[in-house]
Amino acid sequence: MDVILLEKVPNLGSLGDKVSVRPGYGRNFLIPKGKAVAATAAKLAEFEQRRAELEKKASEELAAAQARAEAVARLNVSIAQKAGEEGKLYGSVGTKDIAEAVTAAGVPVERHEVRLPHGPIRLAGDYEITLHLHSDVNATLNLKVIGE
């Protein structure tokens, strides 16, 4: 199945690319999420008319993500959790906790934008957390987990 991408899709292509994908991926994911349209002659013509509008929207999203990344880089966020001896936390600090703390500090962040490659944080200490704000923008957050 051939589709035209309406936005950048990781490991597939960028705005305006005509790519061939498996039918289920196109019908069940790309088209319903608004990331692509079927590559018919009518859709190709319609896309060419809307290309400038879509490119402008994509550049605005990128600029907004870069502004959020700069704001996140200036933050120092602290999260207090109950902890036992040697700084081992009762429970853990996950993506939801981090997203709520950053949002409370003034920069809106969604839970799915927080990357914890080693799983939830289970020890008190200082951490550098990666936030994936856009397909082209990553930010680093300084997080301090305080054991009470």
Curated annotation (Swiss-Prot):
It comes from the Bacteria. GO terms for biological process: translation. SUPFAM superfamilies: L9 N-domain-like, Ribosomal protein L9 C-domain. Keywords: Ribonucleoprotein, Ribosomal protein, RNA-binding, rRNA-binding. One of its GO terms (molecular function) is structural constituent of ribosome. The keyword RNA-binding applies. One of its GO terms (cellular component) is ribosome. The keyword rRNA-binding applies. Pfam families: Ribosomal_L9_C, Ribosomal_L9_N. Belongs to the bacterial ribosomal protein bL9 family. PANTHER family: 50S RIBOSOMAL PROTEIN L9. Binds to the 23S rRNA. NCBIfam families: L9. This is Large ribosomal subunit protein bL9. The gene is rplI.
